Amino acid sequence: MGQTLDESRPLGKYLFVGYAKGRAKRRDILDQATALFGEAGYRGTSLREIAARCGISHPGLLHHFPTKESLLLAVLAHRDEVDQERVTAGHPSGAAALRRLVGIVALNATRRGIVELFTVLSAEATAADHPAHEYFVDRYSRIVRELEVAYAEAREAGDLRPGIEPARAARDLVALMDGLQIQWLLGDPALDMAAAVEEHLKSQLLS
């Protein structure tokens, strides 16, 4: 039988507080690494810079993340987990799943650091020796596949305009969103990413 911490006892309370502090520090490291990777890219950021931003020593950072690669992958996994929860909440399908993306794009417009992170790293990761290369290959494959399923479901429900092929539509939508993010990061003042995605989907969906 497993043991649990008794917070009413001194040792249990000490361990509980210690674990909580460790989790909080780990979260702070992930947040600061996200910002720095977004500003300078993976190759342009050092662990010492991240440690300094967090107010801890280099060995202190290595206690939580022994390598720069492990930190990068933890940052990416954390962001994916958060965003995936938003996308799949309520288990939408078909046209509803596609329209859910408008809200995600609107949210991204309030998270410049996250958009910078993925834009910079996805460009860097085109190099086969980049530690996030496989991650981004898998991520794009998964996103395109999920969108293709959503378009196919919309077609089966009679919600997709004639002549639209799900596989192509999925890739076009990913390309549109990525392109909009780059233009937005470059400072286009007239660009409303969410509105552009919404208009694109309206041109494809019947309901």
Residue ranges of predicted features:
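Helix-turn-helix
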Residues: K25-D28, Q32-A74
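Short, basic, alpha-helical segments at the C-terminal edge of helix-turn-helix-like DNA-binding modules
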Residues: A77-D83
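Hydrophobic alpha-helical connector segments
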Residues: A74, E85-V115, P166-L173
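C-terminal peripheral helix-coil segments that are non-catalytic and often amphipathic
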Residues: G2-F16, A95-R112, S141-A157, L176, ...
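All-alpha amphipathic helical-bundle segments outside canonical DNA-binding/catalytic cores
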Residues: E134-R139, E156-D172
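Hydrophobic alpha-helical segments that form the core
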Residues: L117-T119, I164-Q183, A196-S203
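Amphipathic alpha-helical segments used for helix-helix packing
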Residues: T110-H133
